[in-house]
Amino acid sequence: MTEALRSCVHTHTTFCDGASTPEETVRAALALGFVSLGFSGHGAAAYDDAAMRPEAEVQYRREILRLRAAYAGQLELLLGQEHDALSPYADYPYDYLIESVHYLRHQGDLLCVDLSRADTEAHIRRFGDPYAYCRAYFETCAAAYEKSPANIAGHLDLVSKFNGAGDLFDEADPRYLGPAREALAVAVERGLAVEVNTGAMARGYRPIPYPAPALLRTLRELGGRVILTSDCHDAARLTYGYAEALALLRAEGFRTALVLRAGGFRETAL
């Protein structure tokens, strides 16, 4: 089995919006024969109910470091954070960061892009055009990648979460693909690994991972690197969709993926 299937560094626990404790997630990883497991709690953001509060972040860091010591020699544990592009960066050191866009600024308001279909429809009405909305999202991604110290670009086409039926916008339209590809190009230029994220599959929103096949093709053409994650919010689904994601990567011509270990990224054959 490829090592890419025995690691996940995008996980959420009871310290933010996850259902499982960190130790429950560790035990699930051990049962699956994992080589590494990363915790990526949502970094503090006053506008985001899913984010860790400052006091919770202190407790989160303490607990992950405790588990790292307790399970030393059994599993490599990494202390990470998922950073939202509109929030400040943490004062604490982390082993790695995932850079994600969950919110857009528009006319003085913050709009959450992954809350619900009804909210997405309302956002599109505010922008007056679905492609203007998508362009604003991808431009926010590109700007974030340009300045971010992160290692990983999170769920790059999250804006498509509620477009499973393709009725909100056409993901093959150049007005969608153009800005998406520009964001991908910035991620690759800045050296970020692009996660292939099965989280929306686990929660029933999409039949395929982020990013969509057309964007994976662009990523391969650009020479970008991928890392497989499940965006896990429930330890029971730690590798949900991994087999399908692996098949998709192979079909799109990827021969290797990255695995994040204690010493940094390693490239592994698919």
Regions found by a protein language model. Give the residues of each.
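An N-terminally biased module of ancient metal coordination in phosphate/nucleic-acid-related enzymes
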Residues: 1-85, 91, 95, 160-162, ...
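Conserved, mostly hydrophobic/aromatic
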Residues: 10, 29, 97, 155, ...
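Glycoside hydrolase catalytic-domain groove-lining segments
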Residues: 164, 170, 174, 181-197, ...
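Hydrophobic residues within beta-strands of alpha/beta enzymes
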Residues: 37-39, 97, 153, 194, ...
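Residue-level marker for buried hydrophobic side chains located in beta-strands
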Residues: 7, 38, 152, 226-228
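Extended substrate/RNA-proximal surfaces in nucleic-acid metabolism proteins
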Residues: 51-189
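Long, positively charged, glycine-interspersed low-complexity recognition regions
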Residues: 208, 212-217, 221-270
